[in-house]
Amino acid sequence: MALIEDRLFTRIKNRVGRAIADYNLIEEGDRIAVAVSGGKDSYTLLHILETLRKRAPVRYEIMAINIDSGYPGFRADIIEEHLREHGFVAHMEKTDHYGIIKEKRRPDSSYCSICARLKRGVLYGLAQRYNCNKLALGHHMDDFIETLLLNQFFVGSLKAMAPSMLADNGLTTVIRPLVYVPEEDIIPFSRNNRFPVLCCCCPVCGSADQQRKRMKELLKTLEKENPFVKKSLLKALANVQPRYLLDRRVKY
């Protein structure tokens, strides 16, 4: 089934295209591994990048990568069927992350942080195995803003995410082309196109990451007084003025 090319599609496509241009996310000859978790964000990213690939002035290739972490009930076959129906080159990686996490996790710690680290390492390895020089992740505008607030409130750091950065392995460039796309656009886009959205089936899915949920609620409250608060916070990430901060490592 082809994507529904309505105004919402056009808006998302244009914002992804602008992010690619602003941060030089995609270049001639790139091979891009797109991490597809089964969530609305990664499906949206994959389909928009494929749409742009067919129309872009530069040539690049994409492939989908899914990691099955071994959580009971996770239906990787549903993702695989969707990818096959839409003609995507894909690799489905089966792991026992669930078993590792159960063994290594401290009783008072979250599944999420350990799971994310394990997945990240596998994603980097798969990108190298398939000669992909870039790894595309589905973090959207709200993720950038919430991460900024989380680091300020709970870590004491002015840090968010980067739209493009060299991974820890020094070989793979991680890109986040949805940086300009708000979650409120992705939700109806995914629903309208009937993407088979799946839960990761983690035992604490839906209850973990309470701090991020608190940031979402805070932003909703702020938006009632200032509808442009998210745009302003995102703009702030591109308008850093170190001279007016307290980092003693910065020399003037």
UniProtKB/Swiss-Prot annotation:
Q: In which pathway does it act?
A: tRNA modification
Q: Which cofactor does it need?
A: Mg(2+); [4Fe-4S] cluster
Keyword terms of this UniProt record? 4Fe-4S, ATP-binding, Cytoplasm, Iron, Iron-sulfur, Magnesium, Metal-binding, Nucleotide-binding, RNA-binding, Transferase, tRNA processing, tRNA-binding
Which residues are listed for [4Fe-4S] cluster binding in this entry?
112, 115, 202
Q: Where is this motif: PP-loop motif?
A: 37-42
Q: Does the keyword RNA-binding apply?
A: yes
**Co-factor binding comment:** Binds 1 [4Fe-4S] cluster per subunit. The cluster is chelated by three Cys residues, the fourth Fe has a free coordination site that may bind a sulfur atom transferred from the persulfide of IscS.
Alphabetized PANTHER family for the sequence: AMINOTRAN_5 DOMAIN-CONTAINING PROTEIN, SULFURTRANSFERASE-RELATED
Give the protein's biological function.
Catalyzes the ATP-dependent 2-thiolation of cytidine in position 32 of tRNA, to form 2-thiocytidine (s(2)C32). The sulfur atoms are provided by the cysteine/cysteine desulfurase (IscS) system.
- Which family is annotated? Belongs to the TtcA family.
- Subunit structure of this chain's protein: Homodimer.
Remaining remarks: The thiolation reaction likely consists of two steps: a first activation step by ATP to form an adenylated intermediate of the target base of tRNA, and a second nucleophilic substitution step of the sulfur (S) atom supplied by the hydrosulfide attached to the Fe-S cluster.
Protein's name according to its UniProt entry: tRNA-cytidine(32) 2-sulfurtransferase
